[in-house]
Swiss-Prot record:
GO terms for cellular component: cell surface; extracellular matrix; extracellular region; extracellular space; plasma membrane. It is a peripheral membrane protein. Its main location: membrane. Has a dual branch-promoting and guidance activity, which may play an important role in the patterning of mitral and tufted cell collaterals to the olfactory cortex. Chemoattractant for fetal olfactory epithelial cells. Changing residue 587 to L: In HH1; phenotype consistent with normosmic idiopathic hypogonadotropic hypogonadism; the patient also carries a mutation in FGFR1. One of its GO terms (molecular function) is heparin binding. GO terms for biological process: axon guidance; cell adhesion; chemotaxis; neuron differentiation. This is Anosmin-1. Residues 642-680 are annotated as: Disordered. SMART domains: FN3, WAP. It comes from Homo sapiens (Human). InterPro entries: Anosmin-1, Anosmin-1_Cys_box, Elafin-like_sf, FN3_dom, FN3_sf, Ig-like_fold, WAP_dom. It holds the Pfam family WAP.
Amino acid sequence: MVPGVPGAVLTLCLWLAASSGCLAAGPGAAAARRLDESLSAGSVQRARCASRCLSLQITRISAFFQHFQNNGSLVWCQNHKQCSKCLEPCKESGDLRKHQCQSFCEPLFPKKSYECLTSCEFLKYILLVKQGDCPAPEKASGFAAACVESCEVDNECSGVKKCCSNGCGHTCQVPKTLYKGVPLKPRKELRFTELQSGQLEVKWSSKFNISIEPVIYVVQRRWNYGIHPSEDDATHWQTVAQTTDERVQLTDIRPSRWYQFRVAAVNVHGTRGFTAPSKHFRSSKDPSAPPAPANLRLANSTVNSDGSVTVTIVWDLPEEPDIPVHHYKVFWSWMVSSKSLVPTKKKRRKTTDGFQNSVILEKLQPDCDYVVELQAITYWGQTRLKSAKVSLHFTSTHATNNKEQLVKTRKGGIQTQLPFQRRRPTRPLEVGAPFYQDGQLQVKVYWKKTEDPTVNRYHVRWFPEACAHNRTTGSEASSGMTHENYIILQDLSFSCKYKVTVQPIRPKSHSKAEAVFFTTPPCSALKGKSHKPVGCLGEAGHVLSKVLAKPENLSASFIVQDVNITGHFSWKMAKANLYQPMTGFQVTWAEVTTESRQNSLPNSIISQSQILPSDHYVLTVPNLRPSTLYRLEVQVLTPGGEGPATIKTFRTPELPPSSAHRSHLKHRHPHHYKPSPERY
């Protein structure tokens, strides 16, 4: 660094496909360390790519850089026509090893893409080939000299070892000249300054730079919740900045978190690694109370045989509070025949864990107006922090009818909500029906193309959030890039809930990613439909053990409201054949029809599946078609596999004759038609 140069600080945020969840202790720790290493390696190689771009510019216009070598050089490169083309692949968050550089660069720079192409090829190379040179074959000794093919590429070797020839085979060997031309590590002492603006400034200092190439610093952090710092409970290391200065200012520092940082000095030749983790830092600010629960709504209502009513209330969990929610308090009270509410002392109350977003209220009186209040509670030491209360008004028995629900907070006004099944907007992402082809379970995800003319690529990322057999440990996220408005996801696992994010790629700005969830069916559901044999094996290649448990008394009821039909499907379980603990239920429903359906979207969803927790025996399906046969399958899920399916066919009721004439009045007269539920 040259002192006294007024260079601007540039922070290039890297869009990593890393999860920020806490690491699990135990068998998953090794997998977590491998994930940390792979993510860190990717960040370092992208910094090497950026350093190469700066090195090329120093060569071309060395006179300019004699007094301007490091400070501000990334800023300069970003604003330089040729250098910015070179930097573009270095910022790419997708896996370039799976894509052609030409398809990446030419849409961005149709006329002159040479700088982008050469930079992309360099990045692909260093992502596959580790730094350092292989020793001469005759130098190999011990196991390294064995005449075996123990590796094919460098990434198959641990640590800094490379896949090298020993004259009669290939083995993992320590390279020679590992640090030739590589800058020294920064000094391990990092200094923290909490600014009045709320930002955190992190500073470090460099040792003598033994390289003439520009040095780029990669800054990573990890954190844990709690009163005390803990490396065992910390997140993965995440790259938060890439800069040519010896400082960085971070804006997203949250109270109640213990942060650790580390820094690596990188040039085109590589790095000596990251500094040791810094001392822990925690903001001096006190954490805020949790936000009020959002989108409180009624998800299900069932009339029991004794005349009482059971309802399910759901809400959206907060995305990232200062402190995780410890528990939720739920209060409910009622009034009869439009009279005043019951006294406060007769209010009912219960609590639910902070990670849950639903509660079941049982033994409600029919035809009563209820008020439900919800409040989030967190703890900071001995201090209890409470959110504002949110309330929901509904009428029992007819709760799923088209009666408007009123939701309000103590600090705000009243907000009108449509019922749960009517509130769903048109989703930005759609998922087709899973299908089995070429020996793989696949699914098509599609979306509406953005109107922004600068967007011609989409970064897609997908991973299993939960599986029926609890085999997601170590599962890595997959990602891809496409120019189309769809992508086919391949090699999926059976009986898993997947999350998919799609992010438009803009040349000079960061776009918001949209997300969608879908559930893959069990293998047995496709086995009977496929013309070719489908091998229903576990992930380790072993046939899943037989499960005898089977749902019983599968029944359905339908509520007709104007032109909408909502189905409530329920079942019971007999414990006699349950020799293994249940992990949930796999529910699959589909229309039984040979008619083609008119739909503007490709691969319209005719069959759908959902995985429910083991304590949920009811599924609500809105927007069913009138007078239509539906086939419902319910299976028990256990760690050993799926049980036999209980199958039943139901026909939805017809719409009342006047529904078509009344449909334009449904918002004006919501109580005009209230049929009793039809039961099967």
